[in-house]
C-alpha cells in the first residue's frame, strides 16, 4: 500500500515532496513523450436531475469514469491527472474502495489527484485515512506539494481543499521547482470563492502544463499550457455544450494537447418559434423533430417563443413527454389584433386599458403587461 512522506526537512523552501518512483525506464532511452489524460469534475455520487431520471444519470457518471480508465489502459497512458471534484460530496468508504479497485486495474498508468471544493478534506473525510493502491498519488496537502516520476522526467504538483470555499489566491505565488524537464500543476478554482488566480501570474509560474478543474465548461486559458478540461459529464442543465477530457503529450517541457468529446449525453437549450396557426399537435411534432435532429440521447430544455393563437393554451407537461425533455417554458404571447379590439371596445374597460398602452413597443415590459391584461380581461368576460 502507498505510504506518503514529506521531505520538507530536506527542502527548506518550496513545495513538499510525496512518494515517487525512482527507477529509470526504457521510456527515456527511446525518447518518447509522456502521454497524459487530464480530467476534472467527475462528481461521482451526484444524482443529476434525479426527480426526472431517478438514479440513472448518477450511474452514468460512474460508467463514464470507468470508460475513461479504459481509454487510459488501451492507450497505455503514463499519467491520469484528476484536477479536483472526483466526488460530488464527501466520498463513502465503499466508493473509495471501488475507485481504488478501478485504478488498480491500470497496468501502465499512474494516477495523480487533488481534492476540490465538493470533496474537500474536512475533518472526518474518508480521504484522510484511506490507503490507496501503489499507482495512486493523492496530493492532499493544504500547501503545495509534488510527486516526482524520474522515469518520466516529470513532476506533478498540487494542493487540496480543506474547506468548501477558499477566497485566497493560493496559486498566484506558486512556482515549478525545476526538478524535472516536465512539470505539471493540478489546480482547482478560478472564481472569487474558489481560489481566484491571476492568469498572467500562473502562466509565468514555470509549469509545462497547468491542468485546471472547477469550471465545467472546457476552455483553454493558454493554448497547450493552461486548460480547463471541463466536467467529464454534464452535471446539471446549465452545463450546456459538449463535455470530455484533455489528451496530451509532454516532451522536453512542452505540451501538445487536444480536447476529446466524451460525454454520453449533452444538455441542449433550444427554442421553438410559435406562429398563430400552430396548435399543440403541431408544436409536439416540431419538438419531436428537434429531438431527432440533435439526438435522442441528449437532455433538452425547450422554450416556446413567438405569438400563439389567443384561443390556444399549450400543455407544457404533456409536450415534455416527447423525449428526454427536462423542461418546456412557454414564453409565447397571444397574437392579438389590438387595433381591432380597441375599435370594438372603445367605451369599455378593455378599450380604456388598450388605450393606456398606446405606442408601446413590441417586446417591451409595457407590451407584455398589455398582453397579460388583455388576456385577463377577455378571459373574465368569457367566464
What does each model-found stretch correspond to?
Residues 254-383:
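Accessory, non-catalytic peripheral segments of nucleic-acid enzymes
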Residues 35, 76, 155, 206, ...:
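Short loop/turn motifs at secondary-structure junctions
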Residues 219-279:
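A conserved active-site cap/scaffold subdomain adjacent to cofactor or substrate pockets
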Residues 74-76, 178-179, 293-295:
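Glycine-rich phosphate-binding loop signature in dinucleotide/nucleotide-binding domains
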Residues 79, 88-236, 242-244:
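His/Asp/Glu-rich metal-coordinating catalytic cores
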Residues 4-6, 14, 19, 24-98, ...:
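N-terminal active-site segment of His-dependent metallophosphoesterases
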Amino acid at each position: 500500500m502507498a505510504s506518503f512522506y514529506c521531505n520538507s526537512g530536506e527542502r527548506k523552501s518550496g513545495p513538499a515532496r510525496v512518494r515517487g518512483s525512482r527507477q529509470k525506464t526504457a521510456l527515456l532511452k527511446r525518447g518518447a513523450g509522456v502521454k497524459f489524460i487530464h480530467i476534472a469534475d467527475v462528481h461521482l455520487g451526484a444524482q443529476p436531475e434525479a426527480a426526472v431520471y431517478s438514479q440513472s444519470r448518477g450511474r452514468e457518471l460512474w460508467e463514464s469514469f470507468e470508460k475513461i480508465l479504459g481509454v487510459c489502459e488501451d492507450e497505455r497512458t503514463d499519467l491520469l491527472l484528476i484536477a479536483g471534484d472526483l466526488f460530488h460530496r464527501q466520498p463513502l468508504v465503499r466508493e473509495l474502495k471501488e475507485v481504488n479497485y478501478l485504478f488498480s486495474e491500470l497496468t501502465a498508468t499512474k494516477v495523480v489527484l487533488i481534492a476540490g471544493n465538493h470533496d474537500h478534506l474536512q475533518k472526518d473525510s474518508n480521504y484522510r485515512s484511506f490507503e490507496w493502491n501503489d499507482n495512486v498519488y493523492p496530493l492532499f496537502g493544504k500547501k503545495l506539494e509534488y510527486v516526482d516520476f524520474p522515469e518520466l522526467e516529470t513532476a506533478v504538483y498540487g494542493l487540496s481543499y480543506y474547506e468548501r470555499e477558499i477566497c485566497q489566491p493560493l496559486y498566484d505565488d506558486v512556482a515549478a521547482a525545476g526538478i524535472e524537464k516536465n512539470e505539471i500543476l493540478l489546480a482547482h478554482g478560478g472564481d472569487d470563492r474558489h481560489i481566484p488566480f491571476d492568469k498572467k501570474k500562473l502562466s509565468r509560474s514555470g509549469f509545462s502544463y497547468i491542468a485546471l478543474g472547477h469550471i465545467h465548461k472546457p476552455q483553454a486559458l493558454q493554448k497547450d499550457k493552461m486548460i480547463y478540461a471541463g466536467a467529464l459529464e454534464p452535471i446539471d442543465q446549465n452545463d450546456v455544450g459538449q463535455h470530455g477530457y484533455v489528451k496530451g503529450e509532454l516532451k522536453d517541457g512542452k505540451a501538445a494537447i487536444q480536447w476529446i468529446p466524451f460525454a454520453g449525453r449533452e444538455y441542449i437549450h433550444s427554442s421553438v418559434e410559435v406562429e398563430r396557426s400552430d396548435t399543440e399537435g403541431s408544436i409536439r411534432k416540431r419538438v419531436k423533430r428537434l429531438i431527432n435532429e440533435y439526438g435522442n440521447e441528449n437532455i433538452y430544455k425547450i422554450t416556446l417563443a413567438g405569438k400563439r393563437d389567443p384561443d390556444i393554451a399549450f400543455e407544457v407537461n404533456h409536450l415534455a413527454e416527447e423525449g428526454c425533455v427536462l423542461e418546456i417554458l412557454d414564453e409565447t404571447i397571444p397574437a392579438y389584433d389590438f387595433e381591432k379590439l380597441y375599435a370594438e371596445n372603445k367605451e369599455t374597460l378593455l378599450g380604456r386599458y388598450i388605450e393606456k398602452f398606446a405606442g408601446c413597443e413590441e417586446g417591451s415590459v409595457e407590451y407584455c403587461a398589455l398582453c397579460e391584461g388583455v388576456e385577463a380581461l377577455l378571459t373574465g368576460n368569457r367566464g
